[in-house]
């Protein structure tokens, strides 16, 4: 390919709306262009990258025995209602684009395909003899992100590989889950990425267990917690750990404390000579349930700890046996809108009276009460007195009455001691999620009544797994992990081209002839080569070559008359002066050495 025919348009200035390096470089390098918020066009260079990633994914999926298919992007609402996900995905801040057809039938533009594939499996897979089966597809997905950002990292349209497996038993599901884990490790390794597999929350997809694959990068949206010995890694949403030990509060008689202008843990402790681990703080949250119910929740947690809202959502879902869409702190304005009397914010205790909710217009009229073990394990503590500007000291749970149900709700932090070995300390890293695998169990097959006949002749629901990779996100994550101040530095396996030839002076016939010779020889050797034949200054071409990040560069310049060229490796910046023949041989050998990563 010749640059003069590539429609390459590079930018010198950083686009104002691009916040992170990878987004900036993809725009500046002519790989993508923004069409509207969260929607991008993949230009020729980017499309070559995406095709290479796709081919690697297809090879590894096919090697597991998975079958490629293509499912409809438009999906009937009826399937999603049967699974219980329509309301959560379309109401309020739901992520699904949805519409009505001419007959008034509701449809959703697929953010994921569990419902459709489960329905098809129920029709097509009748007997245990047909199992296991894994189906996968690679296509565009759509999510109506509230705040699209970071380019392809969090867009409203993106390319994804999603696979779904169907099994006769849980043990068989576990085997496929392990096989997919291994396939994902190979995919990311072949793509030249450093990834970490971490325990993860299953989120809106659901299921018994899941694992995320993170590309480590400072700009990552996710916080990963990893043990020093490398034996434990989890997304912070999922992580568990031992909290720091509390500093005991000496037992004393219960007494009231006047605490004016001490409505935060910090101001209370400063004024009263306390430390946060001696205080039980109370958070009032509102849970939005999938059936439309609004449930006030009262959470007790030790004063030095932070609430993990994902853990709270999961705990509430188990407690209510219903899907919980989200939780958020209750505000004074919301209380007023419910026609309720003001609550004593900053001075609430675990025994806050349900009577405060008796006149609520649309909320459930009682608190659902939960407490983190960091709170329930305190023998003596300070807490709010349920009156403005007053707290209680010398309190115990027996003095308060009923102890709330104890469940892990705290957010693990770097510095916490590890569960598997308390001598190990959690460390934090940032990561970009590029893959996620789930053991779904029977959640969807039961909801959609997708069954097979087992070896005893009776009907039972499938055991299911699902396995996703963000193809377009992976491409940008590669840039985030592999770039420098001059531009991108693509791993060889997914680079749009393997070699770029830069002719310093296209008007020089000797340079042009030698460049054309190398171009033809490299093409004949099945090496993907880009020839910069533009009539531009050499400095412009060199800057563009650095920016677009092709792994190897041949510069044909003044030494062309001696048959010599510069061979430059983009990643190391190593420069060698070689004969054209030596440069050709070196490239053939180098690319052959990486043959296992090529498609």
From Swiss-Prot:
Gene3D superfamilies: Anticodon-binding domain, Bira Bifunctional Protein, Domain 2. InterPro entries: aa-tRNA-synt_IIb, aa-tRNA-synth_II, aa-tRNA-synth_II/BPL/LPL, Anticodon-bd, Anticodon-bd_dom_sf, Pro-tRNA-ligase_IIa, Pro-tRNA-synth_IIa_bac-type, Pro-tRNA-Synthase_IIa_type1. Its main location: cytoplasm. Keywords: Aminoacyl-tRNA synthetase, ATP-binding, Cytoplasm, Ligase, Nucleotide-binding, Protein biosynthesis. GO terms for molecular function: aminoacyl-tRNA deacylase activity; ATP binding; proline-tRNA ligase activity. It catalyses: tRNA(Pro) + L-proline + ATP = L-prolyl-tRNA(Pro) + AMP + diphosphate. Its EC number is 6.1.1.15. One of its GO terms (cellular component) is cytosol. GO terms for biological process: prolyl-tRNA aminoacylation. It comes from the Bacteria. Pfam families: HGTP_anticodon, tRNA-synt_2b. It is found in: Cytoplasm. It is an enzyme of class 6 (ligase). Consists of three domains: the N-terminal catalytic domain, the editing domain and the C-terminal anticodon-binding domain. Homodimer. Catalyzes the attachment of proline to tRNA(Pro) in a two-step reaction: proline is first activated by ATP to form Pro-AMP and then transferred to the acceptor end of tRNA(Pro). As ProRS can inadvertently accommodate and process non-cognate amino acids such as alanine and cysteine, to avoid such errors it has two additional distinct editing activities against alanine. One activity is designated as 'pretransfer' editing and involves the tRNA(Pro)-independent hydrolysis of activated Ala-AMP. Belongs to the class-II aminoacyl-tRNA synthetase family. ProS type 1 subfamily. This is Proline--tRNA ligase.
């Amino acid at each position: 390919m010749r640059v003069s025919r590539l429609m390459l348009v590079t930018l010198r200035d950083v686009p104002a709306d691009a916040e992170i390096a990878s987004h900036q470089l993809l725009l500046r390098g002519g790989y993508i262009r923004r069409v509207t918020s969260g929607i991008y066009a993949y230009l020729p260079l980017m499309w070559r990258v995406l095709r290479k990633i796709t081919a690697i994914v297809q090879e590894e999926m096919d090697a597991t025995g998975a079958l490629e298919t293509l499912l409809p992007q438009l999906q009937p609402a009826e399937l999603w209602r049967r699974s219980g996900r329509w309301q959560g995905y379309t109401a309020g801040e739901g992520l699904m684009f949805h519409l009505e057809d001419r007959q008034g039938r509701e449809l959703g533009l697929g953010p994921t395909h569990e419902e459709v594939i489960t329905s098809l499996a129920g029709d097509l897979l009748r007997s245990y003899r047909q199992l296991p089966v894994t189906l996968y597809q690679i296509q565009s997905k759509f999510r109506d992100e509230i705040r699209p950002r970071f380019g392809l990292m969090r867009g409203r349209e993106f390319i994804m590989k999603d696979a779904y497996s169907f099994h006769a038993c849980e043990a068989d599901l576990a085997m496929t889950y392990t096989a997919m884990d291994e396939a994902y490790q190979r995919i990311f390794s072949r793509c030249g990425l450093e990834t970490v597999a971490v325990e993860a929350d299953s989120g809106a997809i659901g299921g018994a267990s899941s694992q995320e694959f993170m590309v480590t990068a400072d700009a990552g949206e996710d916080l990963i917690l990893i043990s020093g010995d490398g034996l434990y890694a989890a997304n912070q949403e999922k992580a568990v750990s031992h909290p720091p030990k509390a500093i005991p509060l000496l037992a004393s008689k219960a007494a009231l404390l006047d605490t004016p202008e001490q409505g935060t843990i910090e101001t209370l402790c400063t004024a009263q000579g306390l430390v946060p681990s001696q205080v039980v703080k109370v958070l009032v949250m509102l849970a939005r349930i999938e059936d439309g119910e609004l449930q006030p929740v009262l959470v007790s947690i030790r004063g030095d700890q932070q609430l993990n809202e994902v853990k709270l959502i999961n705990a509430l879902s188990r407690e209510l046996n219903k899907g919980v869409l989200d939780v958020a702190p209750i505000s004074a304005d919301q209380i007023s809108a419910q026609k309720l009397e003001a609550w004593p914010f900053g001075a609430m205790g675990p025994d806050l009276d349900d009577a405060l909710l008796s006149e609520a217009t649309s909320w459930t009229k009682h608190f659902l009460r939960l407490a983190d073990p960091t709170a329930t394990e305190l023998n003596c503590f300070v807490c709010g007195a349920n009156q403005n500007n007053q707290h209680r000291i010398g309190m115990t749970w027996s003095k308060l009455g009923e102890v709330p149900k104890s469940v892990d709700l705290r957010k693990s932090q770097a510095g916490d001691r590890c569960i598997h070995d308390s001598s190990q300390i959690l460390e934090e890293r940032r990561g970009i999620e590029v893959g996620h695998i789930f053991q779904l169990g029977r959640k969807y097959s039961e909801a959609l009544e997708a069954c097979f006949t087992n070896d005893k002749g009776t009907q039972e629901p499938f055991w299911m797994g699902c396995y996703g990779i963000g193809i377009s996100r992976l491409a940008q994550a590669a840039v985030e992990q592999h770039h420098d101040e001059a531009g991108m530095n693509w791993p060889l396996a997914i680079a749009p081209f393997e070699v770029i030839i830069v002719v310093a002076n296209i008007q020089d016939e000797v340079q042009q002839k030698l460049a054309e010779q190398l171009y033809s020889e490299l093409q004949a050797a099945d090496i993907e080569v880009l020839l910069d034949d533009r009539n531009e200054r050499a400095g412009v071409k060199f800057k563009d070559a650095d920016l677009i990040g092709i792994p190897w560069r041949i510069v044909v310049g003044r030494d062309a008359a001696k048959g010599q060229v510069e061979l430059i490796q983009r990643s190391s910046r190593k420069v060698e002066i070689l004969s054209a023949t030596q440069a050709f041989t070196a490239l053939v050998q180098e690319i052959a050495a990486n043959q296992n990563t090529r498609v």
